[in-house]
């Protein structure tokens, strides 16, 4: 099953599957519903039995698009529609669910896949971050295979030792399009500038999260949850070339780094094929050519998101859900031109502070997470409106 099939992760996963028909067979696809033509084309090429869309209003258009793709007499796939369509699909019969949905709406499908006993290839980091204790309570050892390039790298490097052998995890960051700029220089950057990522081709929300380094903050929380390494032993370094995807430093002083040219098909292949490797899943280095690999410390003043993420990760409970939801609203406001770039983290910080002590412990429920998210989104919207009004008067 591929959830989020028309997005960046989904389309690259399908490319990998089509190049390896002897290894993979896809039985279902899900998408939000904004690209029904592409969804219908994917369904036909993969011969899936079920497609799911979040938007019920696009079902007639989707059915028409499917009819145009399939020949006379060919049975059309079953269509699931509605807010819980992807969750239904995630729980249906298959071996592996690739969750490539963007945002915390991926939580319910993640929980459904785990509860149904599926192997979860997890690209939707938000579901683990906002539902940490809930996800970990359901997941059996080895059931979650991370698809983020950084966590796929850690996943492979950690196999070289035991948890007791690990001194620290080193998560690398490209630094985004604004690497080297000061906080003052970031004040007036535009969405167009922020969307021009120097290394990776991603969707708009993830690209902005990479520009603010919120994405890296989320990855620090994710690394803590996946590998049970304390936050003080998870380090972030800037690596502009994005060749080294993460590193593990062991207690004997050795460091294992996983390195490939930046191409998400590599981590996707790990998620779908593990414990086997998929030959030629992504390009390899030409080691006969000279290249420079640079590493720099993180500028926490210009990019306070990683420090804030550590803070909410340590608070745990509903705090990560508040952080993520507020950020999603602020990113939307920035893309719409109603919030300045630096205003994203300023607003998220204020929402986290106003949230106060999060609800934590074994009593945490999905309802608690959703309630915290709803409050955070509403409060973030209020604050972005106040910011826009103040700037208009200035």
Swiss-Prot record:
Q: In which pathway does it act?
A: Isoprenoid biosynthesis; isopentenyl diphosphate biosynthesis via DXP pathway; isopentenyl diphosphate from 1-deoxy-D-xylulose 5-phosphate: step 1/6
From the Swiss-Prot or TrEMBL record, what is one GO molecular function term? 1-deoxy-D-xylulose-5-phosphate reductoisomerase activity
Q: Which reaction does it catalyse?
A: 2-C-methyl-D-erythritol 4-phosphate + NADP(+) = 1-deoxy-D-xylulose 5-phosphate + NADPH + H(+)
- Amino acids binding NADPH: 6-9, 32, 124, 126, 203
Q: One biological process GO term for this chain?
A: isopentenyl diphosphate biosynthetic process, methylerythritol 4-phosphate pathway involved in terpenoid biosynthetic process
List where the protein spans the membrane.
Answer: none
The answer to whether the entry has keyword NADP is: yes
Broad enzyme group: oxidoreductase
Q: Which keywords fit this entry according to its UniProt record?
A: Isoprene biosynthesis, Manganese, Metal-binding, NADP, Oxidoreductase
**What Pfam families does the database record attribute to this sequence?**
DXP_redisom_C (PF08436), DXP_reductoisom (PF02670), DXPR_C (PF13288)
Q: Where does 1-deoxy-D-xylulose 5-phosphate bind?
A: 125, 149-150, 174, 197, 210, 215-216, 219
* UniProt keyword Metal-binding present: yes
Q: Which InterPro entries match?
A: DXP_reductoisomerase, DXP_reductoisomerase_C, DXP_reductoisomerase_N, DXPR_C, DXPR_C_sf, NAD(P)-bd_dom_sf
Q: Which first-to-last residue range defines the signal peptide?
A: none
Question: Which prosthetic group or cofactor does it need?
Answer: Mg(2+); Mn(2+)
Which EC numbers characterise this protein's activity in its record? 1.1.1.267
Binding-site positions, Mn(2+): 148, 150, 219
Query: What NCBIfam families does the database record attribute to this sequence?
Result: Dxr
What is the role of this chain?
Catalyzes the NADPH-dependent rearrangement and reduction of 1-deoxy-D-xylulose-5-phosphate (DXP) to 2-C-methyl-D-erythritol 4-phosphate (MEP).
The record's similarity note reads: Belongs to the DXR family.
What is the protein name stated in its UniProt record? 1-deoxy-D-xylulose 5-phosphate reductoisomerase
Q: Which organism is it from?
A: Streptomyces avermitilis (strain ATCC 31267 / DSM 46492 / JCM 5070 / NBRC 14893 / NCIMB 12804 / NRRL 8165 / MA-4680)
């Amino acid at each position: 099953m591929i959830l989020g099939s028309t997005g960046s992760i989904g389309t690259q996963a399908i490319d990998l599957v089509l190049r390896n028909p002897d290894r993979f067979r896809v039985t279902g696809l899900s998408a939000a519903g904004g690209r029904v033509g592409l969804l219908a084309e994917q369904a036909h090429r993969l011969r899936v039995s079920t497609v799911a869309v979040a938007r019920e209003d696009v079902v007639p258009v989707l059915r028409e698009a499917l009819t145009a793709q399939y020949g006379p007499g060919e049975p059309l796939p079953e269509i699931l529609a509605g807010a819980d369509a992807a969750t239904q699909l995630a729980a249906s019969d298959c071996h592996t669910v690739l969750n490539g949905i963007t945002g915390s709406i991926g939580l319910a499908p993640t929980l459904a896949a785990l509860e149904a006993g599926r192997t979860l290839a997890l690209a939707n980091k938000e579901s683990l971050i906002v539902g940490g204790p809930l996800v970990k309570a359901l997941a059996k050892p080895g059931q979650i295979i991370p698809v983020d390039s950084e966590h796929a790298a850690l996943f492979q490097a950690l196999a070289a030792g035991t948890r007791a052998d690990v001194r620290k995890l080193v998560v690398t960051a490209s630094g985004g399009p604004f690497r080297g700029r000061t906080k003052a220089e970031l004040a007036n950057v535009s969405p167009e500038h922020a969307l021009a990522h120097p290394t990776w081709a991603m969707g708009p929300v993830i690209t902005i999260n990479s520009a603010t380094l919120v994405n890296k903050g989320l990855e620090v929380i994710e690394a803590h949850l996946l590998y049970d390494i304390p936050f003080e032993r998870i380090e972030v370094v800037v690596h502009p070339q994005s060749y080294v995807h993460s590193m593990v430093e062991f207690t004997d002083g050795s460091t294992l780094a996983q390195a490939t040219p930046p191409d998400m098909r590599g981590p996707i292949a790990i998620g779908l094929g593990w414990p086997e490797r998929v030959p030629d899943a992504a390009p390899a280095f030409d080691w006969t050519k000279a290249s420079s690999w640079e590493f720099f410390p993180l500028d926490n003043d210009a990019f306070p998101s990683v420090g804030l993420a550590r803070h909410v990760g340590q608070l745990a409970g509903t705090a990560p859900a508040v952080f993520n939801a507020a950020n999603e609203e602020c990113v939307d406001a920035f893309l719409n031109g109603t919030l300045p770039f630096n205003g994203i983290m300023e607003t998220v910080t204020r929402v986290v502070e106003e949230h106060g002590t999060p609800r934590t412990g074994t009593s945490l429920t999905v309802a608690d997470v959703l309630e915290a998210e709803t409050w955070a989104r509403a409060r973030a919207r209020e604050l972005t409106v106040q910011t826009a009004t103040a700037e208009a008067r200035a």
